[in-house]
């Protein structure tokens, strides 16, 4: 997170409205760093599978650059252009020296990094004993709604369904102000988190 916590605190003290999003442990870390509640702070956490080793990512990125003859300029870890069941990684490479941009899609089943990640082989040690799974300090939690086909088949489509968990009154206010054009269905908390 670098110096993000300090920047958030500075913005909060100056009276700016701040929306902070991150993994559960990042949100919890911010709240602990701040040491008090701020009315002008809204926190959203993303249900997290875990965070892979930064060293492994660096080596993977270097490997892809060498293999594809370019510089990695962007990455979408869960690209769902072909639907959310067969997601994969979309990598944006800038070729050298021609300066052309190429996009590569690698299915989750064909990418060694994604396979290691999804099978929990490369997560940080703290992820295996994650305390943020049980203690949520965010106002809203968002995620892919894995298992929607079993809970609410009418909400299942090929592009994916999002799960929103409202955790505080502040989170509820934001959700109510943003949901006017959403197709929604309320489900139990247990059904919502079962696949995550």
Q: What name fits each language-model region?
A:
Residues 1-196:
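Iron-sulfur-associated redox domains of electron-transfer enzymes in respiratory
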